[in-house]
Amino acid sequence: MTRNTSEEQLILVDERNRAAGSAGKTAIHRAGLLHRAFSIFVVDARGRIVVQQRSPDKYHSGGLWANSCCGHPRRGERTIAAARRRLGEELGVTSALSFGFFARYQAALGNGMHENEFVYVYFGRLKSAPRPDPAEIADIAHLSFDDIGRRIARDPHAFTFWFKHYFRNHGAEIARLAEQVSRLAAM
């Protein structure tokens, strides 16, 4: 089970992604401070993206569907190392991750929480069956890029803000990179 991470010290950044200090995770999300984050899209051998339904007990966006894994590097931690760590903690898998693109977004999430993130988006190949931590993940699904788009269009309130943001603003990149990872899986 994942430990309580509410007071982890996360990396504050400026608009150019330069480290500008640190603060506790809860305080950052209450105040909407700009901070460093990552998101991961894990792709299976059939080219489908592993998506997760967040645990209803999460401090924000509980019960909503999101990409494979997301999180924050801790103060002093490299972003790629944090991404690998969280992939194991949340999904119970390891994967060689490749950088895909940067994303930047800001949103009020309700419940007094705000996202204001500079995000490193990584892609990886699923090599073993996920073993999700139930404290983090309520359910998982393997969906094609087109299936995800249809589901978001049909029921947008079932998805996290950031997942919809990625598909709206980086959809072509996600489709291209997921296809590349899928081709590597077939080799």
What are these language model-derived features?
Residues 56-58, 72, 104-107:
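Short, catalytically relevant binding-site loops at active-site mouths
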Residues 37-69:
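A glycine-rich, hydrophobic loop/mini-helix early in the fold
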Residues 2-39, 45:
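Acidic, metal-coordinating catalytic segment for phosphate/diphosphate chemistry
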Residues 1-7, 182-187:
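Short, low-complexity, intrinsically disordered N-terminal peptides in bacterial proteins
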Residues 51, 68-100, 122:
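The catalytic Nudix box helix
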Residues 10, 48-49, 140-141:
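A residue-level structural signature of the nucleotidyltransferase/glycosyltransferase Rossmann-like core
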Residues 24-26, 63, 101-109, 113-187:
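Nudix hydrolase/Nudix homology domain
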